[in-house]
Amino acid sequence: MNRGFVAFLGCAAALMAETVPVPKVTKLPVTADSRPLGAANHTLEAVDLAKLGYVEDEFIVSGTANVYDWNVDGTVKVKIPNAPYANRILVRHPADPKKFSGAVMVEIMNAARKFDWGMMLGYLGDHMLERGDAWVGVTQTASLDGLKKFNPARYAALSFANPNPTESCVVLDARGGGKNAPPSTSPMEEGLKFDMLSQVAAALKSTAAGAPMAGFKVDAVYMTTQAGDIVTYINAIHPRATLASGKPAYDGYLIKNVAAAAKIRNCGDTPGKGDPRGPVKDVNVPVIAMVAQGEVVAGLATARPDSEKYRRYEIAGAAHIDKYAYASLPSFPDQIAASGTAQGDPSWPFTAKCDPDIPLSGQTLLKYTYNAALDNLDNWVRKGVAAPKADRIKIKDGASAPEIALDQFGNGLGGIRNPWVDVPVAKYETTSPGPGTCAELGHTLPLNKDRLKSLYVTPQDYGKKVALDVDKLVKEHWFTESDGKKIKAELVAQLGK
């Protein structure tokens, strides 16, 4: 046999080995005694999906996944091949295929409280309903125990069993400033989640009977979440996650609070400051990274320039988090069932209060900017219209440590603008004093009456300036047309015509 042909067959086999398989998908029934954790009608702000023309289904996704090593030079190698896993996904989509937009947003659900929390759903949910998108929540390894406590029978099959359970990790604190953790073993392997995520995308694009989106024309599948896992996926896994069609598993990415990459497996190292694996790499699909003003300084180490496929959007005046993120938390009874406790109450879902006490911000600044970013990403992927570039938030010159440059009202300069900072009536603090989450919560300091009178002749003058600013932001694609109309309608309700 011709050696060249043999070599070709070898290359073809290698390529086939890299093809993302479609996992087994099993639908879980909903009964009087068994339902999903995080079901829409059992969240802090319950949603009746049926009234909105949507349905919700839950599936177990199972298959085999590799565990990888990821070297500092960026090379990725299989450490343990074909380890079995089983995970759950929660899927929401229009009941009528004709009303489906063609876009699916996959969210790696937040596991900070040891149960699933669709944080980005809290921000984007209303807009995705308006667009006709599908949303898919994917469980993280850290939430598995919470699911099993919530309903042991329903979630008995879920597993990220460690294929090398006796491996003892000596985890170095690559970020600095802390102590190295003592050697430890784990019954679960975090690294299985990365191939699992690729296979979830393959399942969502599958047209086979029983597939989660069977009967729906899926044009694009996106991934969203906050912080490190999505960066690791983009940098290490995306280049090798190719479907049988030859297309990438994911068609684009929307990142909240882009940070350094996370470790790729239990005993992998976490890329630290200066590690070339940390910043988001250019890949063959669009990536939009969202950074609130309150996140900018901490994220400077991994900030990078925009490129043909990458945009970084820094949002002036915005804190890390606000009330919209918490709307999609499971209901308090479900939180208690999953973790044994629930923090605070629905109006303040934290154990400790800030000092002084502040309300949980209902500022729509992040929500509206995320909505526009989703539209920009979708247009970039499906229409080839590149997302606009934005100025970065300005850093003060000459400071001993990085510090945001502020305008005369105390709000950040530069970045993606909005009427709250362009036509100000307050200073928007992006952090608050107090324990726990307070450092991530913003609060508002209203300008005094004399200052307001010097800025706006009448309330109607203020309203006119806001409306003009909103029109400009909509035209520049920083707000959606729908959200622009909402802001102006609220102005009319407050101020009159």
Where are these regions (language model features)?
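C-terminal His-loop and adjacent cap/lid subdomain of alpha/beta-hydrolase
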Residues: 18-497
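Hydrophobic h-region of N-terminal signal peptides that target proteins for export
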Residues: 9-18
